[in-house]
Design a protein with these regions (language model features):
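Membrane-embedded architecture of ER/inner-membrane glycosylation machinery
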Residues: 2-12, 16, 167-187, 194-195, ...
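Membrane-integral, polyisoprenol-dependent glycosyltransferases
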Residues: 1-351, 495, 534-542
Length: 550
């Protein structure tokens, strides 16, 4: 008995895990897709236009897209993107890539907060499991690597989760994260989702697991921090831009649900359930496994995760927007619950996840490598023909740097999947490594091919190349002009970013008009079509240059 040591005071058993490998993989996961491509629809052209307006003196409180307020773009995202542009462009990255660093920044912050939440709530080693599960979610890829305000929402939700996780031991830090997360969420996702999560925090003490003094103090501190911060933006907007404040209050203050004068709901639960299957895999099967192994009310983290998921699911069910990225509202608590019983995952289930990941990403990697040779060297011929069909503007381009990245990622993945004694955590690690490999190959080997298909630059360049030199000179000298409709934002943004000709907005005096219409649409009476074009295989979007008949 004299040598007895209480279990809590014993040193943790030594493990052979290497946390630096996790950091290396997350670092590798963060960067593919950030560099070396144009602005891709649907969000990037609009976000970058608002960013340019901010850098040229537009209001920092409201995203300005061609003179119109766009409250879907969080101002804090534009501030961060502008800071990265000032810091990195043009010496370290082009303007587009530098702006995308904002998404990387918020995503990295979100992953870090979720990792700490897992460590605080679940214990040693579980923090990295939460991060690996999130890195394996395909739904997180676009908002993490492209210009998207959803990365701010992810960071805010992760801060809130981390704040909850610290309530039992670090009241001040927990209150700062919880209150700061609420404030950041109100800026990015509106006040309805924020209010629902605040209400969830207030109702948690109804359960005995959350009925302790430190949590009450954390809540008091969170309100002391969060409420003043949440009021700052509406107050400044009301004082400095009253008209914009009224528009925001009535149409966007509640986020996707509209505003006080335009509140909307719709039943879209089937849409979100259908998309959750691929968006949040492997979080949902791992979460389901956890629920079969525990009593929901027995653990603090299970009560929190269940309450959060239930509240967010109700909002998603009545969300009027059918936009899959809103499922990010569920990712942090689902990843937490998925990691809770990961080490207890049965060998058969772990082996299946591992096998499914190896087959899926292995075949995808082989296809991407074969596709790379097909599009650049013409072999296999049938695949080369299909590649040219879907991206006819692509010109074979082999850049040594992306090739080196692709060549590095492939053997690293092969090394990762050859480990023996696969258990739950190793299976999730291999899945995340497979997602990283597939994304890296897609954003290196296929990047020029994708850019030629998704960017408007080839279309704009085709139009300008089709103009007679004399006519182009008349446009440059101001003797002729091209008019474009003020409401045609897509055309205006595309020609501003990639064209050299000036467009006049709603100028009836111009003899030429640039319009957006499907290809092979007949010109209106009194006009002659002198050019038409569209991105490859796009049957809805098209552009045409019309000349007024004499």
């Amino acid at each position: 008995m004299l040598t007895y040591t209480p279990p809590d005071s014993r040193k943790p058993a030594k493990t052979y895990e290497k946390p630096w490998l996790l950091l290396l993989m997350v670092f590798a996961w963060l960067w593919p897709g950030v560099f070396s491509h144009d602005l891709w629809n649907p969000a990037e052209p609009v976000v970058f236009t608002a960013l340019e307006a901010l850098r040229h003196g537009a209001s920092p409180l409201v995203a300005d897209v061609l003179g119109q307020a766009d409250f879907k773009i969080p101002p804090v995202y534009l501030w961060t993107a502008a800071a990265f542009q000032n810091l990195l462009s043009p010496w370290a990255a082009d303007a587009y890539s530098a702006a995308r660093f904002a998404s990387v920044f918020f995503t990295a912050a979100g992953l870090a907060c979720c990792g700490f939440a897992g460590f605080n709530l679940l214990g040693r080693h579980h923090g990295r499991s939460v991060v690996l599960i999130l890195a394996g979610c395909v739904g997180l890829l676009s908002m993490a690597h492209f210009l998207s305000g959803l990365s701010v929402t992810f960071a805010a939700l992760s801060m809130i989760l981390c704040g909850f996780s610290l309530a039992h031991k670090k009241v001040i830090t927990g209150a700062l994260l919880l209150g700061g997360g609420w404030a950041l969420l109100s800026l990015s996702a509106g006040f309805l989702l924020t209010a629902v999560l605040v209400l969830t925090a207030l109702l948690l003490p109804l359960h005995p697991q959350w009925r302790f003094k430190r949590y009450a103090l954390t809540l008091v501190g969170a309100f002391a921090v969060g409420l003043p911060l949440m009021v700052v933006y509406p107050f400044l907007l009301h004082r400095l831009q009253p008209a914009a404040f009224d528009l925001w209050l009535n149409t966007r203050s509640l986020g996707a649900f509209g505003g006080l004068a335009d509140f909307q709901t719709a039943f879209n639960l089937p849409y979100y359930l259908k998309n959750l299957i691929w968006f949040a895999f492997p979080t949902w099967p791992l979460m389901a496994w956890t629920y079969t192994r525990i009593r929901i009310g027995a653990q603090r983290w299970s009560v929190l995760g269940t309450a959060w998921i239930g509240a967010a699911a109700v909002l998603l069910a009545v969300n009027p927007e059918t936009y899959q990225d809103h499922l990010v509202w569920l990712l942090p608590p689902m990843a937490l619950l998925g990691a809770a019983q990961l080490d207890g995952l049965r060998r058969g289930a772990a082996a299946f996840i591992n096998w499914f990941g190896i087959m899926t990403f292995g075949f995808l990697a082989v296809f991407l490598w074969i596709g790379f040779f097909a599009m650049n060297y013409g072999w296999p011929a049938k695949l080369a023909e299909r590649a040219a069909y879907f991206s006819p503007y692509y010109v074979p381009d082999i850049d040594p740097a992306p090739m080196a990245v692709a060549l590095l990622f492939t053997p690293l993945w092969l090394w990762a999947i050859t480990r023996k004694n696969i258990r739950g955590r190793q299976a999730v690690t291999n899945w995340a490594a497979g997602v990283t490999l597939a994304w890296a190959l897609l954003m290196t080997l296929f990047l020029p091919w994708l850019d030629a298909a998704k960017s408007h630059a080839p279309v704009v360049q085709q139009m300008e190349a089709a103009l007679a030199p004399e006519l182009k000179q008349r446009f440059s000298d101001g003797l002729e002009c091209i008019s474009v409709a003020a409401a045609d934002h897509r055309t205006r943004i595309a020609w501003t970013q990639y064209g050299s000709l000036k467009l006049n907005v709603d100028d009836a005096a111009c003899r030429y008009r640039l319009v957006q219409q499907p290809k092979n649409t007949a010109p209106p009476q009194g006009w002659t079509q002198i050019w038409q074009g569209a991105r490859p295989r796009n049957k809805v979007e098209g552009f045409a240059l019309l000349e007024k008949a004499e």
